[in-house]
């Protein structure tokens, strides 16, 4: 069994080759042990190489990945054929992903984005069979709006333990966070820096100067203050260390009030195939 997941995860999206291997090796050396990837990222071999060269035991790592339906442009409009959910097809893709990662199990697997209720329930049912075999330890979802989570709640074939969503000082969702706390669901934030848009914000910079921290650390600290874990990317040892040290920053009421004055509901990850958000 892998170690407990960290509050601050290493995000591996768009880590370029060969920089990715060096970045992941450095992160592991500095104390990261929770790694976020996805089948669509196509970087599993890089992660495997970095882990191998770092000599970190698999049991000390927490690896999470994501699955999604690809190359179906109108996948939110039509129900999939039963063949889309065939055990052999899913098994083949999952086994290839595990082979590329050079591991025989994942600590967590997420449904990357919602589609239709019948599709998502069918996929969760399939994933539960992998969970029963120990191939997947936990099954999560990502980008599921609150109304959709409530809609699925009584119909789920398995309990969910997490929803990974975009969250940052300009996009907080108190209703989602409250629902998560009252339903034993963890929230994992991605894009906690708002695609770097907040790093030059005068309010964030003012708070950073007060705490002798970087603007990125203030954004991360704000997420952590909501009892939210997060995934964040960095490509230099200095930034990797800064991100981890964000846990040490304690924001006060004045900081929270200033951050609350920032513009609200700014979503930076909203491609055409995104769900309809509440």
Cite the ranges covered by each PLM segment:
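N-terminal binding-site loop/beta-alpha segment at the start of enzyme catalytic domains
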Residues: 1-61, 65, 71, 275
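Acidic (Asp/Glu)-rich catalytic clusters
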Residues: 2, 48-58, 97-102, 131, ...
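Short, acidic/polar
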Residues: 16-27, 83-101, 122, 149, ...
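A structural motif
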Residues: 32, 103-106, 136, 160
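A short, structured active-site edge motif that brings together acidic residues
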Residues: 59-72, 108-109, 143, 167
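Surface-exposed, active-site-proximal loop segments in enzymatic domains
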Residues: 72-85
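Active-site groove signature of glycoside hydrolases
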Residues: 101-117
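Beta/alpha (TIM)-barrel catalytic core signal, keyed to glycine-rich beta->alpha loops juxtaposed to Asp/Glu
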Residues: 114-278
């Amino acid at each position: 069994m892998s170690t407990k997941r960290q509050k601050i995860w290493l995000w591996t999206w768009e880590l370029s080759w060969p920089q990715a291997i060096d970045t992941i090796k450095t992160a592991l050396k500095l104390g990261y042990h929770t790694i976020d990837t996805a089948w669509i990222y196509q970087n599993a071999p890089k992660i495997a190489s970095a882990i191998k060269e770092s000599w970190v035991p698999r049991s000390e790592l927490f690896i999470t990945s994501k699955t999604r339906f690809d190359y179906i442009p109108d996948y939110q409009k039509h129900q999939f054929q039963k063949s889309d959910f065939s055990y052999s097809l899913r098994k083949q893709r999952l086994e290839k992903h595990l082979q590329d990662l050079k591991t025989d199990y994942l600590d967590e697997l997420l449904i990357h984005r919602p589609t239709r209720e019948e599709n998502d329930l069918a996929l969760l049912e399939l994933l539960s069979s992998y969970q029963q075999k120990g191939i997947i330890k936990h099954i999560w979802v990502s980008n599921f709006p609150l109304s959709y989570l409530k809609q699925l709640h009584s119909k789920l074939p398995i309990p969910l333990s997490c929803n990974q969503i975009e969250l940052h000082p300009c996009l907080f969702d108190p209703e989602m966070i409250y629902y998560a706390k009252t339903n034993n669901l963890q929230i994992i934030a991605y894009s906690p820096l708002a695609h770097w848009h907040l790093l030059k914000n005068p309010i964030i910079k003012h708070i950073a100067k007060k705490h002798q921290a970087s603007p990125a650390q203030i954004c991360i600290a704000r997420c952590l203050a909501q009892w939210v874990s997060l995934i964040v990317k960095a490509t230099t040892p200095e930034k990797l260390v800064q991100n981890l040290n964000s846990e040490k920053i304690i924001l006060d009421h004045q900081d929270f009030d200033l951050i609350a004055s920032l513009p609200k509901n700014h979503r930076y990850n909203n491609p055409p195939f995104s769900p309809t958000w509440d």
